Amino acid sequence: MTFIKRLEDAYETLLGNYPAGVSSTSTSKYNEIRKIVSEAFLIGENEVYVTGTSRRISNLDTRFAQGNQRNKHTRMAVAFISIPSVDDSELDELIIRTRNSAITTSSKFCNGEERGTIFDGILLFLVFEGETKVYPLAFLVFENDFELKEKAEELIPGIELKEYPRANQSPAQENNKSAKNEDEESAKSYVVFLDIEEDGSIVEFVEDKDKTYRIGDMIWTASHTNGSSAITRRLEVIEVVENLVVCKIKHKYNEPVDKNSLLKFVNIEQDLISFLDLHPNVQNGSEGFVSGDIVDENATTSSDDLPEDFENN
């Protein structure tokens, strides 16, 4: 069975288990694809990173450098770009446009220009929503990695190959770049705290445009449900994407110790991807895009329960 056929079979299984495809919130949906790529290219599964984006190719900027991949050197990345299907007469032109855009967005993750997040090879695929056929777009590869290059040409005959030299920088340049990136990340000021119900619906958001946060910062927040009651949470900043800052719950005051009553929080690896795909206005800094009721309206908070540095805004 050919490499592409194995990928198509795995992607068909993925769609069967996760009808939302690349927008699914599952963190394990790509496991079989990762295994196939690992076996085909003769590298470890931990050296293969698989991701995807729905409709917006520019989101690969976020996908390649998210979570544990940030500032990490990994052997290979695989990206699926999912878009609505088109008539056969438009297919060739669409593939060309998608390929060019995907290469432009992805190349900096291969040549070493993107914040230290780097891959020796990047496989780009096009898929149509709800369909299982996989269209190879291009393979981006570090010019000195002859093993990956030869394997790609063997496994996907005729694939467009893009070779890149690795950008060389002095330690001083690297330090300056790191400092600049840290400043850029800390300058984000649009903060969104996302809570998720058991059914996956988002029930609350709070935004604060007067503060800036870094990953790892701890935040105290109170969510008022009526004139006298509130739910107080300790939050940790776990991701900064564009103007979006996402926090994970660390502790919750004045609620029963019952896991069924606790709010479910966004999983940064995949749920954030789906959230951004489903709510594109978040990336434009829009306000008021989420509303709903707070879980446990009977929760009460007294001033004695709050930490000393808590600010009730």
Curated annotation (Swiss-Prot):
Keywords: Endonuclease, Hydrolase, Nuclease, Restriction system. Residues 289-313 are annotated as: Disordered. Induction: Constitutively expressed during exponential growth. Encoded in an operon with ydiS and ydjA. Signal peptide: none annotated. The keyword Cytoplasm does not apply. Its EC number is 3.1.21.4. It is an enzyme of class 3 (hydrolase). It catalyses: Endonucleolytic cleavage of DNA to give specific double-stranded fragments with terminal 5'-phosphates. Disulfide bonds: none annotated. GO terms for biological process: DNA restriction-modification system. Disruption phenotype: Not essential; its disruption results in increased transformation by plasmid DNA carrying multiple BsuMI target sequences. Triple deletion ydiO-ydiP-ydiS leads to loss of susceptibility to MspJI, which only digests C-methylated DNA. GO terms for molecular function: type II site-specific deoxyribonuclease activity. A P subtype restriction enzyme that recognizes the double-stranded sequence 5'-CTCGAG-3'; the cleavage site is unknown. BsuMI restriction activity requires YdiR, YdiS and YdjA. This is Type II restriction enzyme BsuMI component YdiR.
